[in-house]
Amino acid sequence: MDKVAAVVAAAGRGSRMGTETRKQYLSLAGLPVVGHVLRAMEASSAVKSVVTVVAPGEENYFRLTVVERLGIRKVAAIVPGGEERQDSVYNGLLALAPDTGIVVVHDGARPLLSPGDINAVVQAAAAYGAATLAVPVKDTVKMAGRDGFVLRTLSREHLWLVQTPQAFRYDIIMNAHRQARQKKYAATDDAGLVELLGRPVKIVAGSYENIKITTPEDLTVAEAVIKARQGRLAEAGG
């Protein structure tokens, strides 16, 4: 398989957490949130190197408090982010080695991914060019107008909630970001930029546990998930 590298986007402000500390540095089961992400990348058999994108000026802080503290060996570069997430990911892409074949993009505030998740999207990207982890919608979804009244109910049959990691052939994701910068358009995720090129993106079924830390309640849920996982491991070992 082509050389696989990851870009971890960890430059977000996290204003909805209501804390001065950026959410990716908050403690989760004894580790920074983003530390769980890097440990999963470290355990992935597919990923060979990681570029982490952090808030400008926090590069050394990140290296000391996360990378060196946790003994992470795959981090090849720590680069400053841009004004928006899309800009930050682009900065990370620019820092990748030129012989990169497949790129994994992941949110630094999504700590519950597994090495298996990473490997699965990498395999799909190698086969199809682009892939994203996602889960089927469970709840009823309604479209509402600006007045707050329901316009219609959407069928759940073909609806998926998109997550990260997402993975792409290097040339595809670089072209998608360059086209976006040139034409000044934006998407809420990297797969969306690839879709705008008219390229197919393969869905890889993920886990409902793979939540993004956005509010204080999410931290509580994530703690519970980690404890449940530890309990299952203890039972399997005992």
From Swiss-Prot:
GO terms for biological process: isopentenyl diphosphate biosynthetic process, methylerythritol 4-phosphate pathway. It catalyses: 2-C-methyl-D-erythritol 4-phosphate + CTP + H(+) = 4-CDP-2-C-methyl-D-erythritol + diphosphate. The record marks 156, 212 as: Positions MEP for the nucleophilic attack. Its EC number is 2.7.7.60. It is an enzyme of class 2 (transferase). The keyword Transferase applies. The record marks 16, 23 as: Transition state stabilizer. Keywords: Isoprene biosynthesis, Nucleotidyltransferase, Transferase. Gene3D superfamilies: Spore Coat Polysaccharide Biosynthesis Protein SpsA, Chain A. Pathway: Isoprenoid biosynthesis; isopentenyl diphosphate biosynthesis via DXP pathway; isopentenyl diphosphate from 1-deoxy-D-xylulose 5-phosphate: step 2/6. CDD domains: CDP-ME_synthetase. InterPro entries: IspD, IspD/TarI, IspD/TarI_cytidylyltransf_bact, ISPD_synthase_CS, Nucleotide-diphossugar_trans. GO terms for molecular function: 2-C-methyl-D-erythritol 4-phosphate cytidylyltransferase activity. Catalyzes the formation of 4-diphosphocytidyl-2-C-methyl-D-erythritol from CTP and 2-C-methyl-D-erythritol 4-phosphate (MEP). Belongs to the IspD/TarI cytidylyltransferase family. IspD subfamily. This is 2-C-methyl-D-erythritol 4-phosphate cytidylyltransferase. The gene is ispD.
